[in-house]
Amino acid sequence: MDVLVPIYTGPINPVFPSRAHPSPPLGLTSNLFPIQTNKFYGNLYIGTRHNPSWSHPYSVTWLNGSSYYGLAISHIDDSQRVFGPDPESVPCQYYFNPAGLYSIIISAREFASGNLLSLDQSRHFSIQATLSATTSGSGTIILPIVAGMGFVSGYYTNLTPVFNSSILFSSITKINFSRGYKYRIQLTDGKIWFLYAFPTSSSSTFNLTLASNSQLTTSTKFTGLIQICKVPNESVNNSYPDTIYDASAGVYTTSISLSAQVSGTTGEYWFRFATAGYTNLNPLMFALPHHMQSFGSDTQAYKTGLGLASTTMGIMFAYATKTWHLIEKNLPTQVGFLPIPWNGGSNTYSPTALAAIRAACATDINFDVVNASNLDSMYTSGKIVAMYAQVCLVASRILGDSTLTNTGLTKLKQAMARFTTNTQMYPLVYDTTYKGIISTAGYSSPLADYGNTYYNDHHFHWGYHIYACAVIGLLDPSWLVNDNIRYVNALLRDSANPSESDTYFAMFRNFDWFVGHSWATGIFESGDGKDEESTSEDFNFLYATKLWGMVRNDTVLINRANLMLAVLKNSLNTYIYMTPTTSVQPSQILGNYVTGITFMNKVDYATYFSAEEYCKQGIHMIPTTPISGYLRSPSYVQQDWNAKIAPIINTFSNNWTGILWSNYAIYDPKTAYNTFAASTFTADKIDNGASKTWYLAMAAGMGGSP
């Protein structure tokens, strides 16, 4: 089954008025597609436009200052990482890759007084950059910036190539190469790079000279392709870089298309590389560790052995092929609305458990969800309606109590009507600039509602609302009428539109199919790139998406969510959830058990709101739902608990107490259940996005019934 069928391709729900964004992108001259807001190249059109963009393994930075002009290429080896704040501590809090190390800067003599950067074709995996002189003239350098690109490729038209380096050049050597020109460039840091040149005209020549230790020059205007790549150091290279790079030099990837199929518990997806130049050759593209774990045998055969370090995701290896085929098995088809055991045991509810759950539900159902969710934040209101939806779900599907269910469902529908009719404190609008659904809260204050107006955290926010709507649809199918369906579908299209044929929204705004997880940062400039603070709210969105598919009998949506959850599981357990045996992350941080805030250029065992250990851990647990154990395995939960949480669990008492214990139920549901059932588990230990009803039902349903 093709799972990338559009949700809908028609106009957006008229309940959302149209409005331009207060901060339009810079330098986007034209675009055939809705502008991506949460992708790796965002720094090219935001703020100063001079912060890096990480395509992995390379990063590129536009320079237009007093010293350098053009597009700088950087690559940082593992040995250059900076650990801190005390590099000798075990574990360290963070590490980052140093900035401003511009190995080679693609430029032109005509850029001596400045250059312009224009952008177009903003797509899921790529964007096209064009450099031109600030003075009159028609010369350009067109550079497709593509995730995983093996070369940084620039097509020159009528410009005189110049190359600079902030690290400084040591030597250059011309090497015989039959298809064009090749130079071996050594920098003063000992690193070696290759530069290839392919003139369009066979009569043209390309002669590169070392003008100074900071500049390589040519003497004539040039039209044709120039490609630059780094020779790996011996610690990661077990092949012959000359041979491998030579075989693919002259062809370059301009964009990547995605396709995906699901059959039962197996999902497959493909990256197909559109190419230019010598298109008869196989392009060279670098794969991340989680890609290599999932490659089919038809792709594994093209591994070259050429490796370069990524910034935060381990060593990447180059594959010379026009298509990647990836397979994910054991999709979470068994996961639905109700808890299931992840560590053995039965999900049968004992009379004792049912009595405790009923007592909690009888109290929680009286919660005033209508007024409590009348807030200025889509995120916080979403947590509250989702929490109450869980109470209603338990009343109906676990307790079978129609009185409690009807009482709760009536109030939940009333609370959700405020959002489906868009009459909350800060209504949503359709942004005609970036083509998305945003809160009006940030038009006067960009960081209002956690930056929702500027595309921060949409999958976090919408996930809670979609979950609540899915529960209503399950308990009362008559609620699934046009206006309510269109509300949910608009949120889905905004965050996870699966197809470029839906031209009203960017394709997969939050989820990054290349790195395998979402990015929460929207259109804010950042020296370390986009980031994600809460992995659990990432998969909560996909879980809610699946549940909505279930109540709508939408098998495409269900299967797409299942596949994305499997990809996310692979990615999170490769890069973010760590144990002492993890090999991808450096040993200096493994003792944190979770990377913390994951940026494109660093990881920081921290949160944006607290330095407390329980927050650093808990932000990757909230909310605990039936899907949690699929991504956070019982083994991982046990090791993390023993090392990081058990030493602190009795040293504090607040809403994070319940969050940590609910996560522990994945491994030890009986102890978690007994904790929740005890008289000492008071209301102050329950988060506003959870309830005692849900905690008891979750732990019992995971196998913890007494």
Curated annotation (Swiss-Prot):
<comment type="subunit">
    <text>Interacts with scd2. Interacts with lsb1.</text>
</comment>
<dbReference type="GO" id="GO:0006897">
    <property type="term" value="P:endocytosis"/>
</dbReference>
<feature type="active site">
    <location>
        <position position="533"/>
    </location>
</feature>
<feature type="region of interest" description="beta-sandwich subdomain">
    <location>
        <begin position="1"/>
        <end position="232"/>
    </location>
</feature>
<dbReference type="Pfam" id="PF17652">
    <property type="entry name" value="Glyco_hydro81C"/>
</dbReference>
<dbReference type="InterPro" id="IPR040451">
    <property type="entry name" value="GH81_N"/>
</dbReference>
<dbReference type="GO" id="GO:0072324">
    <property type="term" value="C:ascus epiplasm"/>
</dbReference>
<comment type="function">
    <text>Cleaves internal linkages in 1,3-beta-glucan. Promotes the release of spores from asci by degrading the ascus wall.</text>
</comment>
<feature type="region of interest" description="Required for its role in activation of bipolar cell growth and endocytosis, interaction with lsb1 and proper cytoplasmic localization">
    <location>
        <begin position="1"/>
        <end position="36"/>
    </location>
</feature>
<feature type="region of interest" description="alpha/beta subdomain">
    <location>
        <begin position="233"/>
        <end position="330"/>
    </location>
</feature>
<dbReference type="GO" id="GO:1990819">
    <property type="term" value="C:mating projection actin fusion focus"/>
</dbReference>
<dbReference type="GO" id="GO:0005737">
    <property type="term" value="C:cytoplasm"/>
</dbReference>
<dbReference type="GO" id="GO:0042815">
    <property type="term" value="P:bipolar cell growth"/>
</dbReference>
<feature type="domain" description="GH81">
    <location>
        <begin position="1"/>
        <end position="703"/>
    </location>
</feature>
<feature type="active site">
    <location>
        <position position="537"/>
    </location>
</feature>
<dbReference type="InterPro" id="IPR040720">
    <property type="entry name" value="GH81_C"/>
</dbReference>
<dbReference type="GO" id="GO:0009986">
    <property type="term" value="C:cell surface"/>
</dbReference>
<dbReference type="GO" id="GO:1904541">
    <property type="term" value="P:fungal-type cell wall disassembly involved in conjugation with cellular fusion"/>
</dbReference>
<keyword id="KW-0963">Cytoplasm</keyword>
<feature type="binding site">
    <location>
        <position position="537"/>
    </location>
    <ligand>
        <name>(1,3-beta-D-glucosyl)n</name>
    </ligand>
</feature>
<feature type="binding site">
    <location>
        <position position="533"/>
    </location>
    <ligand>
        <name>(1,3-beta-D-glucosyl)n</name>
    </ligand>
</feature>
<dbReference type="GO" id="GO:0044347">
    <property type="term" value="P:cell wall polysaccharide catabolic process"/>
</dbReference>
<dbReference type="Pfam" id="PF03639">
    <property type="entry name" value="Glyco_hydro_81"/>
</dbReference>
<keyword id="KW-0119">Carbohydrate metabolism</keyword>
<keyword id="KW-0961">Cell wall biogenesis/degradation</keyword>
<dbReference type="GO" id="GO:0042973">
    <property type="term" value="F:glucan endo-1,3-beta-D-glucosidase activity"/>
</dbReference>
<dbReference type="GO" id="GO:0009277">
    <property type="term" value="C:fungal-type cell wall"/>
</dbReference>
<dbReference type="GO" id="GO:0052861">
    <property type="term" value="F:endo-1,3(4)-beta-glucanase activity"/>
</dbReference>
<feature type="region of interest" description="(alpha/beta)6 barrel subdomain">
    <location>
        <begin position="345"/>
        <end position="703"/>
    </location>
</feature>
<feature type="region of interest" description="May provide specificity for triple-helical beta-glucan">
    <location>
        <begin position="602"/>
        <end position="604"/>
    </location>
</feature>
<protein>
    <recommendedName>
        <fullName>Ascus wall glucan endo-1,3-beta-D-glucosidase</fullName>
        <ecNumber>3.2.1.39</ecNumber>
    </recommendedName>
</protein>
<feature type="binding site">
    <location>
        <position position="461"/>
    </location>
    <ligand>
        <name>(1,3-beta-D-glucosyl)n</name>
    </ligand>
</feature>
<keyword id="KW-0326">Glycosidase</keyword>
<dbReference type="GO" id="GO:0005938">
    <property type="term" value="C:cell cortex"/>
</dbReference>
<comment type="function">
    <text>Independent of its glucanase activity; required to establish bipolar cell growth by promoting localization of the scaffold protein scd2 to cell poles and thereby the activation of cdc42. Together with lsb1, plays a role in coupling the endocytic coat to the actin cytoskeleton.</text>
</comment>
<keyword id="KW-0378">Hydrolase</keyword>
<feature type="binding site">
    <location>
        <position position="614"/>
    </location>
    <ligand>
        <name>(1,3-beta-D-glucosyl)n</name>
    </ligand>
</feature>
<comment type="similarity">
    <text>Belongs to the glycosyl hydrolase 81 family.</text>
</comment>
<feature type="binding site">
    <location>
        <position position="531"/>
    </location>
    <ligand>
        <name>(1,3-beta-D-glucosyl)n</name>
    </ligand>
</feature>
<feature type="active site">
    <location>
        <position position="457"/>
    </location>
</feature>
<dbReference type="InterPro" id="IPR005200">
    <property type="entry name" value="Endo-beta-glucanase"/>
</dbReference>
<dbReference type="GO" id="GO:0071998">
    <property type="term" value="P:ascospore release from ascus"/>
</dbReference>
